[in-house]
Amino acid sequence: MINNENESLIAAECHAQADEKKAMLEVENLTKKFGDLLVLDDISTKIYEGEKVVIVGPSGGGKSTFLRCLNVLEDPTAGRILFMGNDLADLKVNINVQRQNIGMVFQQFNLFNNYTVKKNITLAPVGIGISNMRKQKIKNAFVPIYNKFYKKYGDKINAKIDAEKEQLIKQSEELKAVLKDVSAEWEKTKKSEERQGKTYATYDPELTKKKLKLTAKIEKKERAVSHKNHIAEKQVVAPEFSSKKEIKAHAEENAMRLLKRIGLEQKADAYPSTLSGGQKQRIAIARALAMNPKVMLFDEPTSALDPEMVGEVLDLIKELAEEGMTMVIVTHEMGFAKEVGTRILFMSEGKITEENNPKDFFEHPQNDRTKEFLRKVLNA
């Protein structure tokens, strides 16, 4: 993914500095294909707590697809995405629960035109709050029954779990040894192909299938290992809210606080069709913030705005950045990327071909494709 020794050292230095913080998102060998078209090509990277990672690059390079995979709006063909240690591809992981901690802001706002601004912001918190309250009450009802079962059979079950885990780890290591050889042969078949004016990487289809099958088998074994955890006694946990009325009141109070923050408190009862593009995007950001996310994903948040409205949206994102929010931002605004980003990723042909801190990325690019891109966009 990184093309030469200097770039590899720079990437390693970026990750070494970030490793002092907690990894929020871990991307391992992420591949995405649409039919025979390879859009994301074996991407691996980490997003750390508090980072503002800005992704730039030519159109068709896979930036938006990568962002959509992070929130599982697109299913990866192969590879893993871990969010706070949870594998998002694992069927046993509740994706909707994980998404509550990953805010997403789209190019086209995606507001509900038949709801007021306030209801757009409160819709998800109220719905999820009621669902969580009900689920917790049901769980609490079964705690005494479960604990009786644990006292009788817990030790035997945990011993069986340990034996199964050891066997799965052994099988996974054997598959990794085979994958290493197949990957080496697969890389030798790489070719560049022009489609509709864009360059894509292609590989031998049979080796690609073999590589993906092996990767999927390894992922399945590793997911199974991650679930081989000892059982233990459970405790009754009180729900955060005790009634629907309490949930709705809390959500509306939070919505008004967010609207006041973005200067649109007076628009609480207005409908999206009456708002400007800049106002809609600020409300879309407030809606994402209403879930108190750990990470915010921005997919070209200003691309659908008139030029005079871009500034108000970028200013709001800058405020969030200054407060320490972890962010991943796809943008064509190079000045904004330089000012806000703590790390810049350059994507081309489905790969991260360069990454660095903003100053060195813009002043001392290493990759030829990066240099060409910056010449075009900065001199435009």
Short names for language-model regions:
Residues 71:
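Helix-to-loop junction immediately C-terminal to a conserved catalytic motif
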Residues 79-90, 134, 138:
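Conserved ABC transporter NBD signature motif
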Residues 88-103, 210, 244-252, 364-365:
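ABC ATPase NBD coupling module
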Residues 270, 291, 323:
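Conserved signature/switch motifs of ABC ATPase nucleotide-binding domains
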Residues 296-299:
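Catalytic Walker B motif of ABC-type/P-loop ATPase nucleotide-binding domains
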